[in-house]
Amino acid sequence: MGSSLRSFAPGDRAAVLELSRHALQKPQEQVGNPLWTTAEELESELSDWEVPPEETLLVDEIDGEVVGFAGVEVSPGFDHADLFGPLVAPSHRGQKIGTVLLEAAIERAENRSARRIVGAIGSRNATGRLLLERAGFAPSGSATAVFRLNEANHRRVETGPAELTVRPGTPDDLHATMRLYRECFPDGSFPESAWLAGLGQGAVYIGEAKGESRAMVNIDTADRWIYHLGVTADERDRGIGAYVLSEALAGYWSHHPGETLGLSVEADNLPALRLYRRQGFAPMLVLQAFELPL
């Protein structure tokens, strides 16, 4: 039986997708990345990586069959790498494949000068947690709940607060967007360059009142993920966040009909959980974040 650890290649996508699907179906095997359930989701996310996935992802192959997957996503401007996997086929567990894959993923992050690796494990994935902790990862923050929503199940908020309008942002909104981001997410790690790119792509939606930005949300078209729904402090508890999210979703689906979007939120953030459920978001899994300084 010949085992080979090698770089991910386009021909591995079907096998990796099957590993992702299997893990998602088993709470005791769930990880934060990948969350691919369709070939389209996999293609969309990997096609947008600035550093090609072939340079940062790996597979383990035995006798020509892909039995394991891991790696990192490294984006210029970010000081961290996002961990993918490790995922190992059930028939090949107990052979230290996950350990080898994780060590190789860490090495690839180091080679790209990442200062830390951020990963996540399903709250019931005891084996994955032990694997990360043995490699030096430590829990970070509280548990997060992951939700998904497709267009057909979206319950739109029909009426928003008076004088509030929602529109796609432009690069001219960078200063106001960064101000909101720093206020709402003081520990956030998204660099200004990422926000500028999102504004240029029309992926950032702005809620305005009396000519001032009062709320924002970022919908990443490649990841199909909703990031950073934020409302300035003196405008909270007025339904602004719910309306901005709803209008942003409607705007997104007008250009990307039928796509499914995801988001994550702290599992004990009851107001946010209620907001998302009211708009039709369905719970998918609960994750615990982990971090490894490099």
Q: What is each stretch, according to the model?
A:
Residues P90-R93, G119-R129, A233, G262-L273, ...:
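Conserved beta-strand-loop-alpha-helix junction that forms the acyl-donor binding cleft
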Residues A120-G122, A138-A152, S264, A282-L294:
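Conserved catalytic-core motifs of GNAT/GCN5-like acyltransferases
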Residues L24-L46, M178-Q201:
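Conserved GNAT-fold acetyl-CoA-binding loop/helix
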Residues A109-S123, Y252-S264:
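Conserved GNAT acetyl-CoA-binding A-motif
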Residues S4-E18, L164-T177:
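A short beta-loop-alpha structural element at the N-terminal edge
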Residues Q95, T99, S123-G141, A242-Y243, ...:
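Conserved active-site alpha-helix within GNAT-family acetyltransferase domains
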Residues V88, G94-E107, R134, V231, ...:
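Conserved acetyl-CoA-binding loop-helix of GNAT-fold acetyltransferases
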Residues S44-V59, G68, D82, L196-I206, ...:
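A short helix-loop-beta-strand connector motif used in the catalytic cores of GNAT acetyltransferases and
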